[in-house]
Swiss-Prot record:
Protein name: Electron transfer flavoprotein beta subunit lysine methyltransferase
Subunit structure: Interacts with HSPD1; this protein may possibly be a methylation substrate.
Gene3D superfamilies: Vaccinia Virus protein VP39
EC number: 2.1.1.-
Location in the cell: Cytoplasm; Mitochondrion matrix
Cytoplasm found in the keyword field: yes
GO molecular function: heat shock protein binding; protein-lysine N-methyltransferase activity
Length: 255
């Protein structure tokens, strides 16, 4: 079975937000290459492809797994690290990134937290659009490395990447939180909803959510607190990679 078919949908409901395993270290990248293991960097470069096609944001180059990569076709268990969700440009993230690029005033001069950052595309879009401070968050240390590489691809100085579960910690104030494709499991959706509500009530922070209309999102109670800002038709390659999902939208959170 092709590797991509095994992990297109996360198997674990906590895959983005819980530690990869109990022994995983937590890293915070602050400068280009400061924590990039040379062997890991070489492995990622060998087994991903730099691409800007087939997405809503041709302005952004990313290292992704594509059909031209070996592990797109290999069995999932042959990939030697945690499941590489960061190596797919998910449709909710595409919509968020497109929206920020088209509406730079949303982030210009503001501090932004990209929750479940994955490949880092939305954080990169925020930086391109003039955000003054960015923190990308993903629990997978390899995602942190990939984000740093993707910053370099786009001519950006890297922003901090925090690789830990922040749902059980207190964070400083950000002007904007963005998250895409995080409502794929009911339990995770409940936890995110509670965390976002508490953060909003504490800090008054604006929250933007990108999602292609997965059932776990469309049927969740958070929908009663959301206002749709925009909906995009997904490019054909993204539709094919996501089981026929045809659109993706950006929502403004108003609890």
């Amino acid at each position: 079975m092709a590797f991509s078919l095994c992990w297109k949908a996360p198997r674990s409901p906590w895959s983005f937000l819980q530690a990869v395993n109990n022994g995983s270290p937590l890293f915070l990248w602050r400068t280009v290459g400061s924590c990039l293991d040379p062997k890991m960097k070489a492995y990622l470069e060998e087994n991903t492809e730099v691409t800007s096609s087939g997405s809503l944001t041709p302005e952004i180059q990313l290292r992704l797994l594509t059909p031209r990569c070996k592990f797109w076709w290999e069995r999932a268990d042959l990939w030697p690290y945690s499941d590489p969700y960061w190596a797919i440009y998910w449709p909710g993230g595409q919509a968020l990134s497109r929206y920020l690029l088209d509406n730079p005033a949303v982030v210009r001069g503001k501090s932004v937290l990209d929750l479940g950052s994955g490949c880092g595309a939305t954080a990169i879009a925020a930086k391109m659009s003039g955000a003054s401070k960015i923190l990308a968050n993903d629990i997978d240390p390899i995602a942190g490395m990939a984000i740093t590489l993707n910053c370099k691809l786009n001519g950006l100085n890297p922003f901090p990447v925090l690789t830990k579960n922040i749902l059980n910690t207190q964070q400083g104030k950000f002007d904007l939180i963005v998250l895409g494709d995080m409502f794929y499991d009911e339990d995770l959706a409940d936890s995110l909803h509670l965390w976002l509500q508490n953060y909003f009530w504490t800090h008054g922070t604006r929250v933007l959510i990108g999602d292609p209309g997965r059932p776990q999102f469309s049927g969740h109670s958070i929908r009663h607190q959301l206002y749709q800002l925009v909906e995009y038709t997904l490019p054909e390659p993204t539709q094919q990679e996501n089981n026929g999902l045809t659109t993706s939208a950006v929502w403004d959170f108003h609890p």
